[in-house]
A protein has these predicted regions:
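Nucleotidyltransferase catalytic core that binds NTPs
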Residues: 1-103, 107
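Hydrophobic alpha-helical segments, chiefly the membrane-spanning helices
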Residues: 112-114
């Protein structure tokens, strides 16, 4: 079974999120979604989420492409998820293609762009 992972804050869940999750699910048999609880913890310049974690979790839970949801608060917790779960492919948005990803993260899973 091929396990995929993608993550976001998923604030104000919309059709673009659903399409991204649909594309991510095409690349794996089991899709784990990391739910960032508050992007401002690691990056104060980001906006605080409008919806609560519960609201965002509930919306993700209702999406048929999502098999498991793992909330996380910090980049360190994200790294812990990526190193603790048997992830075969990490799916990230095309807009992140030019960003550097640490070799530690790359060594744990293949990165694919949705």
């Amino acid at each position: 079974m091929r396990v995929g992972f993608t993550c976001s804050a998923f604030d104000l869940f919309h059709a673009g999120h659903v399409m991204m999750l649909k594309e991510a699910k095409k690349q794996c048999d089991f899709l784990i979604v990391g739910l960032q609880t508050d992007p401002t913890i690691d990056r104060p310049e980001k906006n605080k989420p409008i919806q609560t974690v519960f609201e965002r979790y509930t919306q993700l839970e209702a999406c048929k492409y999502v098999d498991q949801i793992i909330p996380y608060a910090t980049e360190k917790e994200l790294l812990d998820i990526l190193t603790s779960y048997p992830i075969d492919v990490r799916i990230i948005g095309e807009e992140y293609r030019s960003e550097e990803h640490t070799s530690e993260l790359q060594s744990h899973s293949f990165i694919s762009y949705a």
